A protein has these predicted regions:
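Extended, non-catalytic subsegments within catalytic or DNA/protein-binding/adaptor domains
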Residues: 1-204
Length: 204
């Protein structure tokens, strides 16, 4: 990522954030670098723009901060080092270093290229990037991509968590759902965790 195309770097960070937080696109583009804090290589804490109004307005949906934990933060084996390429904390450090020059906004995710590089990224543009990322994961596995939209990352992330045995209440709170029906009706899908992870790692 240190020398990769900036479009790839931005899209990769956005995809990792979407998959590890289960946030909506609008919530991801509301994250800022103000108050952003790293706790070594183990986690990063971010805050949304105070003016941001989430889709689900409730005490739960206004939670802050957003805490993102590292993936294999201290890799020892070749396999651990390979999986560490998917670490969102690592990706965040590289992204912030590469956007430190030319940054025009306090928003975390920025545009690149075009007429105004370094400006705040819109949720619409982010949606396109997320769909491209999911499509790439499917095609890398040699499978046809289903009908996709940016919201698919939200369903994928929460489905992986449920299938991996994460406590349902923790999943529900992360996604800001009031009950089980929302997840089962709109988001649940069977996910082969190892296949998806391996497909993305090959592109890292």
């Amino acid at each position: 990522m240190s020398t990769a195309d900036m479009g790839f770097v931005t899209a990769k960070l956005a995809a990792l954030l979407a998959l590890t937080t289960a946030e909506r696109g609008s919530e991801l583009t509301a994250l800022t670098i103000q108050g952003l804090t790293f706790s070594g290589d183990y986690k990063v804490t971010l805050f949304p723009d105070p003016a941001f109004v989430p889709k689900t307005v409730s005490e739960l949906s206004r939670r802050a901060p957003v805490v993102i934990r590292a993936f294999h933060p201290d890799p020892r084996t070749p396999e651990q080092r390979r999986r560490h390429l998917l670490c969102p904390v690592r990706a965040m450090r590289i992204y912030l270093r590469r956007t430190s020059v030319g940054r025009r906004s306090q928003q975390l995710l920025l545009t690149y290229g075009g007429r105004s590089p370094g400006s705040a990224l819109s949720s619409q543009r982010l949606a396109h990037w997320l769909v491209d990322g999911i499509t790439l994961a499917y095609t890398t596995m040699g499978e046809p991509a289903p009908r996709l939209k940016a919201h698919s990352t939200r369903g994928t992330a929460t489905s992986i968590a449920v299938l991996a045995g994460v406590d349902w209440e923790e999943v529900r709170q992360a996604a800001v759902w009031r009950g089980d029906l929302t997840f089962m009706k709109h988001y649940y899908r069977y996910v082969n965790v190892r296949s998806v992870a391996d497909a993305v790692l090959e592109q890292a």
